[in-house]
Design a protein with these regions (language model features):
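Conserved HGGG/HGGXW glycine-rich cap/lid loop of the alpha/beta-hydrolase fold
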Residues: 11-65
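Active-site loop/oxyanion-hole signature of alpha/beta-hydrolase fold enzymes
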Residues: 54-95, 251
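Conserved alpha/beta-hydrolase "nucleophile elbow" surrounding the catalytic nucleophile
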Residues: 92, 96-101, 208
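Flexible "cap/lid" loop of the alpha/beta hydrolase fold
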Residues: 102-110, 115-147
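Conserved alpha/beta-hydrolase catalytic His-Asp/Glu region
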Residues: 129-135, 142-200
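Short beta-strand/loop motif that positions the catalytic acidic residue
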Residues: 199, 205-207, 211
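Conserved alpha/beta-hydrolase "acid-adjacent" motif
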Residues: 212-218
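Catalytic active-site module of serine/aspartate enzymes centered on a nucleophile-bearing elbow/loop
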Residues: 229-260
Length: 260
């Protein structure tokens, strides 16, 4: 049976936030990447088969309202904490993808006891001990998205052979907002590694074996600093794991969320 998604909005801290939601079960909040998100992903559907999945669209990304006061990733995290409180979703699990992993990690440090489980997939947010996070200012946004795939064919599988004008505008707006909230330092926080040890919830950090955007050392550092974390590497994928191997990724996360 197809998963039916509802789309709507809520207000948190005086800011309109757009949401997608589907499924039943324990609540799972998915935080999307710095390139925004497609409205339909097999990965989302697979998680919604077992969980109440909530996907907020980051403020200022794509055509979502862009509040003037949101100037950093921690601002987004504070806003989302307020959103969860308003939705009665205390104790939800967080799944952060790339840039969304940074937001999820910040949220976890704010209320460590108010979290069921934490999943970070190729997370940004910490300075890699070796290597650098790919600077999207140095290449076009199309090249940046392509760099997220290990298999070049996966780009067309997800976005089609011809990119629409609306998709290009979407990426342009996402890039603009990323530069506002994560420019200096680029895509990491100096404070986050020092705050992660306070997060006691079980955590899973997943790294694509061929990630060309976030070095594996960043995921390793997150797993090292989180006191109850395990690190897994997925073969045959790059940074955009949820689009290259959606069902395999969903299976790993579902098993982790269900584990004792």
């Amino acid at each position: 049976m197809p998963i039916e998604w509802t789309r709507g909005s809520v207000t948190a801290a005086g800011t309109e936030l757009r949401l997608m939601r589907a499924g039943k079960g324990s609540p799972v909040v998915i935080l999307h990447r710095d390139i925004g998100t497609l409205e339909q992903l097999a990965f989302y559907d697979a998680l919604a088969e077992r969980h109440d999945v909530i996907i907020p669209i980051h403020p200022g990304y794509s055509e979502a309202p862009r509040p003037d006061w949101v100037r950093g990733v921690r601002d987004i995290a504070v806003l989302y904490r307020s959103m969860l409180e308003g939705l009665g979703l205390r104790g939800a699990s967080l799944v952060g993808l790339g840039f969304g992993g940074w937001i999820a990690a910040e949220m976890a440090t704010m209320a460590p006891a108010d979290l069921s489980r934490l999943v970070l997939v190729g997370p940004m947010g910490v300075k890699p001990p070796t290597g650098d996070i790919l600077d999207q200012a140095l290449i076009s946004y199309i090249e940046y998205v392509r760099a997220g795939f290990h298999d070049p064919r996966a780009f067309e599988t997800n976005y089609g052979e011809t990119l629409s004008t609306s998709q290009l505008v979407h990426w342009d707006l996402c890039r603009e907002m990323s530069f506002r909230v994560a420019w200096k330092p680029y895509m990491y926080s100096d404070s986050l590694p020092h705050l992660l040890p306070g997060v006691k919830a079980p955590a899973l950090v997943i790294q694509g074996a061929h990630d060309q955007i976030v070095p594996a050392s960043a995921s390793a550092l997150c797993a090292e600093r989180l006191p109850n974390a395990k690190l897994e590497t997925m073969a045959g994928v790059g940074h955009l794991i949820e689009m290259e191997q959606p069902l395999a990724l969903a299976s790993r996360i579902t098993a982790f969320l269900a584990s004792a």
